[in-house]
């Protein structure tokens, strides 16, 4: 299944090879997990995983660098808001301004509006949450992003705090920026993770 933990493995395996501890998990109802996938549960799923691993020998005493893509970036922002003191950096790829806005822009005027009306949004939207991020922050924009459209990207970037870096990556699709073994952005991400405080 696309967008589950096994699909994301190649995008972060290079970090583990560089001795960066990596925690991957499937949200409820995705991959091998049971339950129902819901937007309002994604950050709670991340929190449950964090509670399970934070006292392990490999992790104990370390602060997190959150890395989320698409809906995972939305969840990473909400996780950050309830764990600020445990996070030292945030990296977001293909992040949108609002959940309903993403649906409307992806599916067009009529269908997008109908689908957006049925969506149960979370209490805080990414464009609101991002204004509360105080740690170092990177936003990764694939040049051929087929997940987040330009309107949502611009609305989100308008809300960015001043410490945010934007990495525009020409020629790459959503979920492909870090999957390429020859990607120079991999080194940039590794440098960010190792040097952020």
Specify the residue positions occupied by each region the protein language model found:
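Hydrolase active-site cap/lid region
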Residues: 75-129, 135, 179
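Membrane-embedded segments
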Residues: 1-52, 62
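Alpha/beta-hydrolase fold nucleophile elbow
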Residues: 58-70
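Short alpha-helix in the alpha/beta-hydrolase fold that links the catalytic acid
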Residues: 126, 135, 149-158
């Amino acid at each position: 299944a696309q967008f589950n933990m096994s699909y994301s493995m190649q995008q972060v395996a290079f970090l583990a090879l560089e001795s960066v501890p990596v925690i991957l998990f499937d949200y409820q109802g995705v991959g091998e997990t049971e339950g129902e996938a819901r937007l309002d549960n994604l950050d709670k799923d991340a929190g449950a995983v964090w509670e399970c691993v934070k006292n392990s020998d490999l992790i104990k005493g370390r602060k997190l660098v959150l890395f989320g893509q698409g809906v995972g970036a939305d969840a990473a922002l909400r996780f950050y808001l309830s764990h600020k003191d445990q996070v030292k950096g945030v990296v977001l790829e293909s992040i949108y301004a609002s959940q309903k806005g993403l649906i409307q822009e992806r599916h067009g005027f009529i269908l997008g509006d109908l689908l957006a009306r049925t969506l149960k949004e979370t209490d805080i939207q990414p464009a609101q949450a991002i204004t509360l991020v105080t740690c170092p922050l990177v936003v990764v924009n694939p040049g051929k992003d087929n997940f987040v459209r330009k309107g949502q990207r611009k609305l989100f970037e308008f809300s960015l705090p001043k410490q945010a870096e934007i990495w525009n990556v020409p020629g790459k699709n959503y979920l492909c920026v870090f999957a390429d073994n020859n990607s120079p952005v991999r080194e940039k991400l590794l440098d960010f993770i190792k040097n952020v405080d």
